[in-house]
Amino acid sequence: MSRYRGPRLKIVRRLGPLPGFTQKLYKSKSQYLGSSTTSSSSNKKISQYNIRLLEKQKLRFYYGLTERQLLKYVTIARNAKGPTGQVLLQLLEMRLDNIVFRLGMAPTIPAARQLVNHRHILVNDFTVNIPSYSCKLGDKISVQKRFESKTNIFANSTQSASLKVPSHLTLNPAKNEGLVHQIVDREFIGAKINELLVVEYYSRQV
């Protein structure tokens, strides 16, 4: 399954707020948390499978993953030490496109992915154009010194002013660079997801 490229508000109305997916939800939350979800849930009982499916979809759309990519991350998380759900979220949070977003250099993860693809982002002073690149402790995330790169980042930083940089990252606005100084704690995960439901959804596939 390819990455979703359709109307984002359609997804937000169905799944609820997804700040990493689109910034539009901040303008009028009531439109997306309205009667459609409430009425449908009261008229018919949602199966456990559908509950897990919706949670999986939230995670997939928030981080902008294909189905194959998400399944790969779940497989890695299950084979790693520690709670599978927590490890899964940590893996996703350490993606370069997400780090750029969480640093406030882009208004959404898709916008951050575009910056990475266009070679505007440096990791430890080397250009990295792979959005799925897994950042490590001590990695420095900075911006190409070309004028157009700075212009793009400054514009995105203004749009992202409402986003708070999480505690596992530090941002130096003067140098337009950030640092990954620890593994993200569960409470600072960007996506408001019940990761256990996602793990349960994939339990028969992994």
Curated annotation (Swiss-Prot):
Q: SUPFAM superfamilies attached here?
A: Alpha-L RNA-binding motif
Which PROSITE patterns does this chain map to? RIBOSOMAL_S4, S4
Give the CC-aspect GO terms.
Answer: chloroplast; small ribosomal subunit
Primary localization class, coarse? plastid
The record's subcellular location field reads: Plastid, Chloroplast
SMART domains found in the cross-reference section? Ribosomal_S4, S4
User: What's a Pfam family in this record?
Assistant: S4
Q: What does the entry give for GO biological process?
A: ribosomal small subunit biogenesis; translation
Q: Which InterPro entries does the UniProt record give?
A: Ribosomal_uS4, Ribosomal_uS4_bac-type, Ribosomal_uS4_CS, Ribosomal_uS4_N, S4_RNA-bd, S4_RNA-bd_sf
Keywords per UniProt: Chloroplast, Plastid, Ribonucleoprotein, Ribosomal protein, RNA-binding, rRNA-binding
Q: Name one GO molecular function term.
A: structural constituent of ribosome
Does Ribosomal protein count among this protein's keywords?
yes
Occurrences of domain S4 RNA-binding (ranges): 94-152
Q: How does it assemble?
A: Part of the 30S ribosomal subunit. Contacts protein S5. The interaction surface between S4 and S5 is involved in control of translational fidelity.
Q: Which family does it belong to?
A: Belongs to the universal ribosomal protein uS4 family.
Q: Which HAMAP family match?
A: Ribosomal_uS4_B (MF_01306_B)
Name the job this protein performs. One of the primary rRNA binding proteins, it binds directly to 16S rRNA where it nucleates assembly of the body of the 30S subunit. With S5 and S12 plays an important role in translational accuracy.
Query: What is the name listed in the Swiss-Prot or TrEMBL entry for this protein?
Result: Small ribosomal subunit protein uS4c
Name of the gene = rps4
